[in-house]
Regions:
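Glycine-rich phosphate-binding loops of nucleotide-dependent enzymes
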Residues: 2-248
Length: 248
């Protein structure tokens, strides 16, 4: 039995000064899926991500999440509902320790509901942080200042920060950008592990990553959906090969 549709866009679009950056995208995401969104530069991938995350307000269309249309809902409210986006450029507090970075995110999640209650539950917050550190493989570096981490570990930390918000859907923008091959392999393993309890959407240019971890792939071109399918289907799609894949 197929998993339930957890997120769906209907005729989603946004214009910038008359330019259609995203143009009528219909997108259906199933619970527990790893979905890759690919396409050439300027295809609208990051803009589409920003629409899903609430960073941009669509010009047209709908975004349905758990039975509610969230199109145009501000980013902080969408995050609270369970859709969290990481960034293409690492976004951490460099002067804080690894532990403090994640704890800050976890505390903000708690204080959205009960500011003073957070202090009574500080032990639970710390337990949550330690659990996340173990999940992302940074337990032994919890006291290290974030600025002193390797680039790859900084990206893992950013994923940890997003996990502290208790996401249902995790949007990862170029999660392996700038990583060494070894770091990329570890990140692929981490994403696959996280997908056992989360639904994950990634924008990624490294096709070895896309082929290696995706359950399903959406290809955007000129802001519109060019093709969707499993990795083998996309590999063998003539339109995709012509527009994007080339020699991949």
């Amino acid at each position: 039995m197929a998993a339930e549709i957890i997120l769906e866009t209907k005729d989603l679009g946004i214009n910038f000064s008359g330019l259609k950056a995203v143009d009528g995208v219909n997108f259906r995401l199933r619970e527990g899926e790893i979905r890759s969104v690919i396409g050439p530069n300027g295809a609208g991938k990051t803009t589409f991500f920003n629409l899903l995350a609430g960073n941009l307000r669509p010009t047209k269309g709908e975004i349905w999440f758990r039975g509610k249309n969230i199109a145009g809902v501000p980013q902080h409210k969408i995050c609270r509902k369970g859709i969290t986006k990481s960034h293409q450029i690492t976004s951490i507090f460099p002067g804080l320790s690894v532990f403090e970075n994640i704890r800050l995110s976890a505390q903000m999640r708690v204080t959205q509901y009960n500011f003073w209650g957070e202090y009574r539950r500080i032990d639970k917050v710390n337990e949550k942080v330690m659990s996340i550190l173990e999940e992302i493989g940074l337990t032994d570096k919890k006291n290290r200042v974030a600025a002193n981490l390797t680039y790859g570990d900084q990206r893992y930390l950013e994923i940890g920060i997003t996990l502290a918000t208790d996401p249902v859907i995790l949007l990862l923008d170029e999660p392996t950008a700038g990583m060494t091959p070894a770091e990329t392999r570890e990140t692929m393993k981490l994403i696959q592990k996280l997908a056992k309890k989360l639904t994950i959407v990634i924008v990624e240019h490294d096709m070895s990553v896309v082929w290696g971890i995706s359950h399903y792939i959406t290809v955007l071109h000129n802001g519109a959906t060019l093709a969707e399918g499993t990795p083998p289907e996309i590999k063998n799609n003539d339109d995709v090969r012509r527009v994007y894949l080339g020699g991949h």
